[in-house]
From Swiss-Prot:
Binding site for ATP: 617-624
Function: This protein is involved in the repair of mismatches in DNA. It is possible that it carries out the mismatch recognition step. This protein has a weak ATPase activity.
Protein name per its UniProtKB record: DNA mismatch repair protein MutS
The keyword Metal-binding is assigned to this record: no
GO-annotated cellular components: cytosol
CDD domains cross-referenced by the UniProt entry: ABC_MutS1
Ranges in coiled-coil conformation: none
InterPro entries per UniProt: DNA_mismatch_repair_MutS, DNA_mismatch_repair_MutS-lik_N, DNA_mismatch_repair_MutS/MSH, DNA_mismatch_repair_MutS_C, DNA_mismatch_repair_MutS_clamp, DNA_mismatch_repair_MutS_core, DNA_mismatch_repair_MutS_N, DNA_mismatch_repair_MutS_sf
SUPFAM superfamilies tied to this protein: DNA repair protein MutS, domain I (SSF55271), DNA repair protein MutS, domain II (SSF53150), DNA repair protein MutS, domain III (SSF48334), P-loop containing nucleoside triphosphate hydrolases (SSF52540)
Gene name of the encoded protein: mutS
Species in which this protein is naturally found: Porphyromonas gingivalis (strain ATCC BAA-308 / W83)
């Protein structure tokens, strides 16, 4: 930004600091206020709703000003960060009382959407990830860091893999090379906060050295990243950004985990959204997370979000989780003991981070001690359980007894939220501190004693000893008794009805008291700093405790879901079979009225006999719910949860793909046929033998012919794919697809049943073998409140179209067509209505698909049937097409 002409020393200092962070809002500490100036003040006043004013800035100059009290920082800072602003906090670096010149100021922290440890900025149930993406020609690196927890990860892969990670981890801020910003936007279409860094911040060699330096290593083999140069480049960019934002205390970032796509089920952004895993698509709806998250600690809440979007592909790890859930399910007493003590732990993970960064408050130090005390009974239950995996988890809990006992001895149990706001260090810790406190806190007794002494000496019964900030300690005498005042008293202030005096004894006492308070503050600060330093020695075991508690909390949550919702333990194995008996949708079931049972359904899929199920049925019958519940049950099984069914066997799934139709809450701007085809293409290009594929109403965004053709060919492709036979559910209103059952061995028709009783729809919501020939669209339109005359007219038209279809079917040759592809019935599936000269359909006319007796059409048909396509040259084809055009024109 251009440097304005400035006059006052304060504003000169402000603009010098502002020039170093032109893209951040600068909160400039002036006395007891944080002030913003110029453009920052205008922006801050709009976001924070604070008054915008102006102040003089030298001769004939004014500058915009907006500010708030320093103690309100925790209130206003989150609002700026959530608005996507970077905020530079500029504090006074020296005591204004000790300098006669301009107070020295400097940036103490740069807070951004992705880099914050402020509790009011952070969400307790979500991670606050900062991401960096390094862009290569084909391979991209990605690194993610939550500075508030110390979680640091890196990986690399193609653009699709990076997009999946961005979708599932939901970083609050992404770092990109400035020269690659345009390409990044074209590839990922990220709508969140992006920060462009200079290209040097993504230097491959420099960033490798930066990562090695942070961990004090000579090789990254221990992290499994030695050969992943793009991943390491991204990780180095994250560390460079922390340097830039003045975050230098990073002892809690103790490891760099490799993001390995082979460990987890592939879920793309469309699947996460359409299955409503983390958030509902409709306002007031519920997500899977809302239903199964019964975690107690913030660490558990954050962990379960990650587990949901990263299901496991290793049956052994899945079964290990299941066995712990089973133990908790069958042992309610142990479950209750652990749950009770988890409530006492709080956010241990972020407390450890604050301790490592030297920012833990006295009150938080007490909470850390409470958390460590709560770990002991939890460890006791776990290590004595008759379940091996739970014992292993309990063995990871470090009680850190020395630290716990030290905090118990040295910190007041009711310690204040900050140093200087009350006593922090307990009595008996330091003899000097105890002496100073005795001196400072005995003031009331001393003043009462002095006051009584002077009353007796002077004979003034109304004499009063008091204190204020202006004059300090003084003796007040009413005017009626001022003739009794001793000569050695010094008059300090004259009031209307009284005089105020000081004495040498009072002056000495005041100096002693005020000096003691300053010494108490300094000594408490020193003793507390030593305690924080001791805590920092325990960062690694405390982080291990946090991880173990998070996992324990999630498994306890799964057991609670099983208890509440009648979930069962599924079998997860290496087979290719999905066999669900009486499966239920975990979210919809919990939203039904108490007296309305959920209609359960069976699903069987494999790769040998029943690979593809075509599901037909009317709107509102439950087709979409059936598809989604199959995917959700499979996903829940592979995160280690119990599932809503009577029994379930899940042959391990390595990817779940979904494609929902345009009416199924596709966000605005994406409900186009092109996007539908792009998503379908993405699925077809990434199929594996273990994929689970859900197509819901594919092809509705175009004409009927086009839609049927595309849907038909996709089912054929999935069935005939030589490399993979993915298990597939295909819900459709194109009843013509039912013909595929007779042509493709592993395709089977099912329908979600509905009945029309006395002109009213009865949705049975039961999956039955066989295809459906009716969509009951008109009945659904009636239920939706469509005007009666429109419903009646639609009914008449439907009857005529059905009669015409029956007529055509009767005229079809009875010979069996052995060719694969749609029958003549499907090909002639688009009837037309005769119209008058204004284009309106003529009521009462016989409807027809084609004017079959039209001689022109008969001639064209004969011309086409007589063609020998195998011997036709391109030129002859064009000539024949021209002949047909002449026939249509009538010459």
């Amino acid at each position: 930004m251009a440097k304005p002409v400035v006059e006052t020393p304060l504003m000169r200092q402000y603009f010098q600091i502002k020039q170093k962070h032109p893209d951040a809002i600068l909160l400039f500490r002036v006395g007891d206020f944080y002030e913003t100036f110029s453009e920052d003040a205008i922006v801050a006043s709009e976001i924070l709703g604070i008054t915008l004013t102006r102040r003089a800035n030298g001769a004939a100059q004014f500058v915009e000003l907006a500010g708030f009290p320093h103690h309100a920082l925790d209130t206003y800072l989150p609002k700026l960060v959530r608005a996507g602003k970077r905020v530079a906090i500029c504090d006074q670096l020296e005591d204004p009382k000790k300098t006669k010149t301009l107070v020295k100021r400097g940036i103490t922290e740069l807070v951004t959407p992705g880099v914050s440890t402020n509790d009011n900025v952070l969400s307790h149930k979500e991670n606050n990830f900062l991401a960096a993406v390094s862009c290569g020609k084909e391979v991209f690196g990605i690194s993610l860091l939550d500075i508030s927890t110390g979680e640091f990860m890196a990986g690399q892969g193609n653009a699709d893999y990076v997009e999946k990670l961005l979708t599932n981890y939901r970083p609050k801020e992404i770092l990109v090379e400035r020269s690659e910003r345009s390409r990044f936007n074209d590839l990922f279409h990220w709508s969140g906060f992006i920060f462009d860094m200079e290209d040097w911040a993504f230097s491959s060699e420099n960033n490798r050295l930066r990562v090695l330096k942070h961990f004090d290593l000579k090789s990254l083999k221990g992290f499994g990243l030695e050969e992943l140069s793009m991943a390491v480049t991204a990780a180095g960019a994250v560390l460079n950004y922390l340097d830039l934002t003045q975050h230098h205390q990073l002892q809690h970032i103790t490891s760099l985990s490799r993001l390995d796509e082979n460990r987890y089920v592939r879920l793309d952004k469309f699947t996460v959204r359409s299955l409503e895993l983390l958030s509902p698509m409709n306002e007031g709806g519920k997500s899977l997370l809302d239903i199964i998250d019964h975690t107690i600690t913030p660490m558990g809440a954050r962990r379960i979000r990650q587990w949901i979007v990263f299901p496991l592909k290793d049956p052994a790890r899945i079964q290990a989780r299941q066995r712990v859930v089973e133990f908790f399910f069958r042992h309610p007493e142990e479950r209750a003991i652990i749950a009770e003590h988890l409530t006492e732990i709080g956010d241990l993970e972020r407390l450890v981070t604050k301790g490592a960064m030297g920012r833990i408050s006295p009150r938080e130090m007490v909470q850390l001690r409470v958390a460590l005390q709560a770990l002991e009974p939890i460890k006791e239950v776990c290590t004595h359980a008759d379940e091996e995996n739970l014992r292993t988890l309990g063995g990871k809990l470090e009680l850190c007894k020395e630290l716990r006992d030290k905090i118990l001895r040295e910190v007041m149990p009711d310690a204040p939220a900050a140093l200087g706001r009350g006593p922090v260090i307990a009595h008996g810790v330091d003899a000097t501190l105890d002496e100073l406190r005795a001196l400072a806190y005995s003031g009331k007794d001393y003043l009462i004693k002095l006051q009584q002494q002077e009353i007796e000496r002077t004979g003034i019964p109304s004499l009063k000893v008091a204190y204020n900030n202006v004059f300090g300690y003084y003796i007040e005498v009413r005017n009626t008794h001022k003739d009794k005042v001793p000569a050695e008293w010094i008059r300090k202030q004259t009031l209307v009805s009284a005089e105020r005096y000081i004495t040498e004894e009072l002056k000495e006492y005041e100096a002693k008291i005020l000096g003691a308070e300053e010494k108490i503050a300094a000594l408490e600060g020193q003793l507390y700093a030593l305690l924080v330093a001791e805590l920092q020695r325990y960062v690694a075991p405390l982080q291990q405790d946090s991880q173990a508690v998070a996992s324990l909390d999630c498994l306890l949550s799964f057991a609670e879901s099983a208890r509440r919702y009648r979930f069962i333990c599924p079998v997860v194995d290496e087979s290719f079979t999905i066999d669900i008996k009486a499966g239920r949708h975990p979210v919809i079931e919990q939203q039904l009225p108490a007296d309305e049972p959920y209609i359960a359904n069976d699903i069987y899929l494999d790769t040998d006999r029943q690979q593809v199920i075509i599901v037909t049925g009317p709107n509102m019958s439950g087709k979409s719910a059936l598809l989604r519940q199959t995917a959700l049950i499979s996903l829940m099984a592979q995160i280690g949860s119990f599932v809503p069914a009577e029994s379930a066997r899940i042959g391990m799934v390595d990817s779940i793909f979904t494609r929902v139709g345009a009416s199924d809450n596709i966000s605005m701007g994406e409900s186009t046929f092109m996007v539908e085809m792009q998503e379908a293409s993405n699925i077809l290009n990434n199929l594996t033998p273990r994929s689970l594929v859900l197509f819901d109403e594919l092809g509705r965004g175009t004409s009927t012919y086009d839609g049927i053709s595309i849907a038909w060919s996709i089912v054929e492709y999935i069935h005939d794919n030589p490399k993979a036979h993915p298990r597939t559910l295909f819900a459709t209103h194109y009843h013509e697809l039912n013909e595929l059952e007779g042509q493709l061995d592993r395709v089977h028709n099912f329908n979600v049943s509905a009945r029309e009783v006395d002109g009213k729809m009865l949705f049975l919501r039961k999956l039955e073998p066989g295809g459906s020939a009716h969509s009951f669209g008109i009945q659904v339109a009636r239920l939706g409140g469509m005007p009666h005359h429109i419903v009646q007219r639609a009914t008449d038209i439907l009857h005529r179209l059905e009669q015409e279809r029956e007529k055509i079917e009767e005229e079809e040759p009875k010979t069996k067509d052995t060719k694969r592809g749609p029958s003549e019935k499907v090909k002639n599936a688009s009837p037309t209505l005769p119209r008058d000269e204004k284009g309106r359909s003529i009521d009462g006319y016989q409807l027809s698909f084609f004017q079959l007796d039209d001689p022109v059409l008969s001639q064209i048909r004969e011309e086409i049937l007589d063609l020998n396509i195998d011997n036709l040259t391109p030129l002859e084809a064009l000539n024949k097409l021209n002949d047909i055009k002449r026939i249509l024109r009538g010459y």
